[in-house]
Every structure is written in structure tokens, then in C-alpha cells.
Amino acid sequence: MESELEALAPRPASPAEPPFQALVEAAGGRGQVLLVGELWEREQSRALLRDFAGAVFPPESAPGKPGCAEAESAGTAAATESHGAPGAKAERAIRSPLVFVLCRVGSLTSRESRRRLREMLRDVRDRRCEGAALVGVLVADTGADDARAPELQLLETLLRTVFGRQVGGPVQAAAFRPGCPASSLAVQEAACRALQAAGPGRPEGAWERPARTGLLTCFSWGPRRQRKNRGVTSSQGPAQEHLQFSEEELALTPVFPNGDCEDRGNGSRAQDGGVHIPPDPPEDTR
């Protein structure tokens, strides 16, 4: 009898995961979360976003929920509405209540790579809506030591130069190592702190949950190249080596949850990355 009662007794849950899930749900659900990652090599960039999403937002199955295809269709429609092609400021606005910005350790090792990362963060800052939480994530190599304190401090310093006094509040930093569950919990805890700090300043009704979607929207970030003639934007790549980066013209490349990325400016399509997550169960701002 005692053993039966013990079996029926509620078991303590993980200390980090339930608050994280509850806060994400309160902010609109995982379908409202945005991942931003560097674009250096297409498949590797995709794999990084996919691995991170799978570790921090583990798949959960629930009976009676919409299937993958149905959820993917709903998620694509929501992403298309909210994250249209780069253009006017309103069209480029990031309306997600929780944003993860992923960077590799190698992006902090040289002045040029830090400059690129700073430009990415500034672009996200300028597009991010008031009251949103943001977590800068340092991605360590698989098999690396858990301790990445020097690099994490560099990331925090970089975040502080861009977001100012928001760092430590709605802007947090964490280290993530693929294959290390403890690092996934650290990222979740950082997201909890950011969401809790952003909560009081969040405009009422700012976030609306898309219907029946369990998809995360992802961006692979790459600066737009521009001709010396500011009226023309080039997409030729290697043939335009004389072009310079213009901070005012930087833009996030939208990647929809089904993996399709459409640049409405030139009609081309690319597969820069996308992550499918199954549905949930019942300065001085500078």
C-alpha cells in the first residue's frame, strides 16, 4: 500500500525547466521565439540553429495536437506576416518577445570578427521592439571545456556596448555547449531572468500568439553589400570584392520555419536554415 501511495505522489520537477516553459508560454509560446545566428557556411549555420533549438526547446509530443505539416504551414504564415522582406522600418521590426542571438567563440577572437558581431547586435537592437527579452549565447565547440569565462565576459562586454544598462536585466548572456545538458539549463535560466526583467516594461497586448504553431522563427544574419552608388544594392557576392559594408544598410536575412528564405527584392530563394519544433502541450538603451 505504501509503495502504491509513493507511486501516486507527485515527483519534484526540474528546477529550471518548468519556470522557463511557463515564462515562454506567458510570452506567447515557443512559436514567438526568435533565433538569430551568424551566417558563415550555410549548412553549418543551419545545424547550429537546429542543435540549439533542439537542446533548449526539446521536442514534446501530445495527443490531439496538429501534425508537423499542419503546424509548419501555420508557422510559415505567421513568420511571413511578422518578418517580411527587408525594407521599411516597420516591416523589419522584430516583434518576438524573446530573442536568442547566437555567436561562436571564434567571433570574439579578432577585432574584425568582433566588429561584425557588434554590427549584428546593433541591427537586432534597432529592430527589436520595446519590452522584448534578449539572450546573447556564446556557442562553444563540442567537447570543449565547460568553463568559457573569458569568452563569456567578452560577450557581456560587447552586449554592454550595444545595449547599455539593459545588460543584467532584459538582456542576458549565457554559454551553450552542444551535447551538454547543463549548458542548456544555463541558457534557459538566462532566458528566465531576461523575461522576468522585461515583464514590467512590456506593453500590454504587445505579443499575440500565432494560432496552432510550435515553430521557432530563425534568422541567419549576413550584412548586405552595397555598391558605391548607394541607389543600387548588389547580390553578386564574389564578383563585387570592392564593395564595402554600410552599417545603415545592414539587414537580417529572413529564414522562415519551413527552411525557405525569400528575398522579395530580387525574387531569389535560398535555403539558409530553419528549425521545426513540435507543438507545445495542454543608450541608455544603446
From Swiss-Prot:
InterPro entries: C2orf72-like_C. Residues 59-89, 225-286 are annotated as: Disordered. It comes from the Eukaryota. Residues 69-85 have a biased composition (Low complexity). This is Uncharacterized protein C2orf72 homolog. It comes from Mus musculus (Mouse).
